[in-house]
């Protein structure tokens, strides 16, 4: 009898302990659910090379603790890979232009640099790149300074030359140092394709200020044909931040050299706007890479792009830059309203001029985004 009572008591104690654990789990879930309600979710979208991942890194630098030494060092192979990839694109591009261009002679690499060029092109085509040594950096610098390579670089928009090319080529000595640790600028310029989903949580006014919203920012990678698989997972996000590289109106895609990048951006923006899961979602459009755009538009007319074929230049210099930018901005505004259902026209839509590499501008822009979304929340709560 005593044994039975003892067992019964143990079972009751076990049940009580289990019930207490269940209650604690439920309490934590409830607390986390409440906490989640106060987090505004933002989704970063954009076509390849739009600069959205650079925006993501800027947010980490601006509103979090930035990159620690281990994270900075993890970018060493990325930076070195960018260097090798860049010099290969330029070398191979010069050979192609030397064979096919009308004025082909200026794209012929000098005899003394041809062997160096072949060697570096072979390295750039590998799956695994060697660490950048002083010797290799000197050879890359020699080839970079070759007149044919400089002529080729001037036509970089035709050859998939990355935006980071000039920056890394001008810093080869530092990048090849045996004790090299990437700077935050190196990390911002470094180009690596986003795969999967990465996220960070931040507040533009600091975590300790009660008035500040807390945001969770998602950067999503993936090929064009994979978008339909994951887009619905972000139903209910507070806002979509769509990055459009306005400087790329004369360039083609990496994955499809017959497809203009601006046309790809137009089609992606239109597709995202029409998604049912974003019917009540705010849209923040970042017209990115303005720093490149303002230089390019004075030399390459906007109307080389099919979408901008009705563009007519009106002036030169700063006035022409402003005119061209306003034209592009209006095109995106028209596309937004054409692609937005009548019952969704009251959702928030804002356009911001952006340069992802300009930290002060990114900080200012995100303060404006924060202010816009906080006002929307107050309005929906009936407090405005």
UniProtKB/Swiss-Prot annotation:
Residues 41-54 are annotated as: G1 motif. Residues 186-194 are annotated as: G2 motif. GO terms for cellular component: cytoplasm; heterotrimeric G-protein complex. A lipid is attached at residue 5 (S-palmitoyl cysteine). One of its GO terms (molecular function) is GTP binding. Its cofactor is Mg(2+). Residues 38-384 form the G-alpha domain. Residues 215-224 are annotated as: G3 motif. Residues 284-291 are annotated as: G4 motif. Keywords: GTP-binding, Hydrolase, Lipoprotein, Magnesium, Metal-binding, Myristate, Nucleotide-binding, Palmitate, Transducer. The keyword Nucleus does not apply. PROSITE patterns: G_ALPHA. Residues 354-359 are annotated as: G5 motif. SMART domains: G_alpha (SM00275). GO terms for biological process: adenylate cyclase-modulating G protein-coupled receptor signaling pathway. GTP binds at residues 49-54, 163, 188-189, 194, 222, 288-289, 291, 356. A lipid is attached at residue 2 (N-myristoyl glycine). Mg(2+) binds at residues 53, 194. Pfam families: G-alpha. It comes from the Eukaryota. The helical domain (69-189) is required for self-activation. G proteins are composed of 3 units; alpha, beta and gamma. The alpha chain contains the guanine nucleotide binding site. Belongs to the G-alpha family. This is Guanine nucleotide-binding protein alpha-1 subunit. It comes from Glycine max (Soybean).
């Amino acid at each position: 009898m005593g044994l039975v009572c003892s067992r019964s008591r143990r079972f009751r104690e076990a049940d009580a302990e289990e019930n207490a654990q269940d209650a604690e789990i439920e309490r934590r879930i409830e607390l986390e659910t409440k906490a989640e309600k106060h987090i505004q979710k933002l989704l970063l979208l954009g076509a390849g090379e739009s600069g959205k991942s650079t925006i993501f890194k800027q947010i980490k630098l601006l509103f979090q603790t930035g990159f620690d030494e281990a994270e900075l060092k993890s970018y060493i192979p990325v930076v070195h890979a960018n260097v090798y990839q860049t010099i290969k694109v330029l070398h191979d591009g010069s050979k192609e232009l030397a064979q096919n261009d009308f004025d082909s002679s200026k794209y012929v690499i000098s005899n003394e640099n041809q062997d160096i060029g072949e060697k570096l092109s072979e390295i750039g085509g590998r799956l695994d790149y060697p660490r950048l040594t002083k010797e290799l950096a000197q050879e890359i610098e020699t080839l970079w300074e070759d007149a044919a390579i400089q002529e080729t670089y001037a036509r970089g928009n035709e050859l998939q030359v990355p935006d980071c090319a000039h920056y890394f080529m001008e810093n080869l000595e530092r990048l090849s140092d045996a004790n090299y640790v990437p700077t935050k600028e190196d990390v911002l310029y470094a180009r690596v394709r986003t795969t999967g989903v990465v996220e960070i949580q931040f507040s533009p006014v600091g975590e300790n200020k009660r008035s500040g919203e807390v945001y969770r920012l998602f950067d999503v990678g993936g090929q064009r044909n994979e978008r339909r698989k994951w887009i619905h997972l972000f139903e209910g996000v507070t806002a979509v931040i769509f990055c459009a590289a306005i400087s790329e109106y004369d360039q083609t895609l990496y994955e499809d050299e017959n497809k203009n990048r601006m046309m790809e951006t137009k089609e992606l923006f239109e597709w995202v706007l029409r998604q049912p899961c974003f019917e009540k979602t705010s849209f923040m459009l970042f017209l990115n890479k303005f720093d490149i755009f303002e230089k390019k538009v004075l030399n390459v007319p906007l109307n080389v792009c099919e979408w901008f074929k009705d563009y007519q230049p009106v002036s030169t210099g700063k006035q022409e830059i402003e005119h061209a930018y306003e034209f592009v901005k209006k095109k995106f505004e028209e596309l937004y309203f054409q692609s937005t259902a009548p019952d969704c026209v009251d959702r928030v839509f804002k356009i911001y001029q952006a340069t992802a590499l300009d930290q002060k501008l990114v900080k200012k822009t995100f303060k404006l985004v924060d202010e816009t979304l906080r006002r929307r929340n107050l309005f929906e709560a009936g407090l405005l």
